């Protein structure tokens, strides 16, 4: 196993730990609301009975069902959401392509062959003045990779290939699916924690229900910061994985490093704030210049790539 394969394996373990934490917090919030709903006398006993289905955890089940429905709706519309608000072009190999369009399509095919993948993501060019890229899609069959026109014009062949390899790695690692699920769980948790305390105010304030209400009040303060930290940690872990995946496919870390440096310098020398109003897409970009970005800093990404041996 190469160092790049090791870092991917290590980051998968970290991802699983974060996902498990999300699911535990999500279920715990639902169970606390159920404790308030049944007006329990003892918190511990009520939680045990709810978890063992001696008492049906109605709110908890509803929360999971709502999350499932929202995920299904997002699956149907995610790609159109990601591409909305911009002039974009599908690279359709059945039509006449420009030299640049031919080039990026050939680069994608080379990477698919190198990775022994049996699917081909749709390839889009977004007309934009900034250099960036993103991947989208719930699974391989509806996946896509989008590159901005500025990125295609300013990167050389190997750098472009590295960027496409990075986005292809996101698809291979199911990062888009993961990001979507975590975002939905976070929003539902925040909504339930913020509003559920007031839904059952008419209940008698038995000690168990009252304690559950107090815990939810504390979570109202803690959850926004906790979910932000978890999302940042998770997303940064996946970016390191995608960088490593790109270098592994390229058999060289230098093209990815050069691409990151050029993109970073482009944002440093130009003010693109407000150019892209699509916040969902902005979070998925290869590079983000925001202070509280879900992406690691370019410096850390380059350091991580530089110390890995292929």
Swiss-Prot record:
It is a multi-pass membrane protein. The keyword Zinc applies. InterPro entries: HtpX_protease, Pept_M48_protease_HtpX, Peptidase_M48. It is found in: Cell inner membrane. Keywords: Cell inner membrane, Cell membrane, Hydrolase, Membrane, Metal-binding, Metalloprotease, Protease, Transmembrane, Transmembrane helix, Zinc. The active site is at residue 167. It comes from the Bacteria. One of its GO terms (biological process) is proteolysis. Zn(2+) binds at residues 166, 170, 239. GO terms for cellular component: plasma membrane. GO terms for molecular function: metalloendopeptidase activity; zinc ion binding. Its main location: membrane. The keyword Oxidoreductase does not apply. It is an enzyme of class 3 (hydrolase). Its cofactor is Zn(2+). The chain crosses the membrane at residues 16-36, 55-75, 182-202, 214-234. Its EC number is 3.4.24.-. Binds 1 zinc ion per subunit. Belongs to the peptidase M48B family. This is Protease HtpX homolog. It comes from Helicobacter pylori (strain Shi470).
């Amino acid at each position: 196993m190469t160092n790049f394969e090791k870092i991917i394996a290590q980051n998968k373990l970290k991802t699983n730990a974060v996902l498990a934490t999300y699911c535990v917090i999500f279920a715990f919030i639902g169970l606390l609301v159920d404790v308030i709903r049944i007006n329990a006398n003892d918190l511990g006993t009520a939680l045990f009975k709810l978890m063992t289905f001696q008492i049906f955890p109605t709110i908890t089940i509803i929360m999971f069902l709502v999350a499932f429905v929202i995920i299904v709706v997002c699956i149907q519309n995610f790609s159109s959401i990601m591409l909305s608000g911009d002039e974009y072009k599908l690279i359709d190999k059945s039509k006449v392509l420009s030299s640049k369009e031919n080039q990026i399509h050939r680069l994608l095919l080379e990477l698919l062959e190198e990775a022994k993948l049996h699917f081909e993501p749709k390839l889009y060019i977004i007309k934009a003045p900034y250099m960036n890229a993103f991947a989208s899609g719930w699974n391989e069959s509806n996946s896509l990779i989008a590159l901005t026109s500025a990125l295609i014009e300013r990167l050389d062949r190997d750098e472009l290939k590295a960027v496409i390899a990075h986005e292809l790695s996101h698809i291979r690692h199911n990062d888009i699916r993961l990001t979507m699920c975590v975002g939905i769980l976070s929003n539902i948790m925040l909504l339930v924690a913020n509003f559920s305390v007031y839904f059952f105010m008419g209940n008698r304030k038995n000690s168990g229900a009252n304690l559950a209400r107090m815990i939810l009040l504390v979570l109202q303060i803690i959850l926004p910061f906790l979910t932000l930290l978890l999302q940042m940690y998770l997303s940064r872990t996946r970016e390191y994985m995608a960088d490593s995946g790109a270098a592994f496919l390229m058999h060289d870390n230098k093209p990815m490093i050069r691409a990151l440096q050029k993109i970073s310098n482009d944002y440093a020398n130009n003010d693109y704030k407000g150019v892209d109003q699509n916040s969902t897409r902005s979070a998925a970009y290869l590079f983000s210049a925001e202070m509280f970005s879900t992406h690691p800093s370019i410096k850390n990404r380059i350091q991580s790539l530089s110390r890995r041996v292929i």
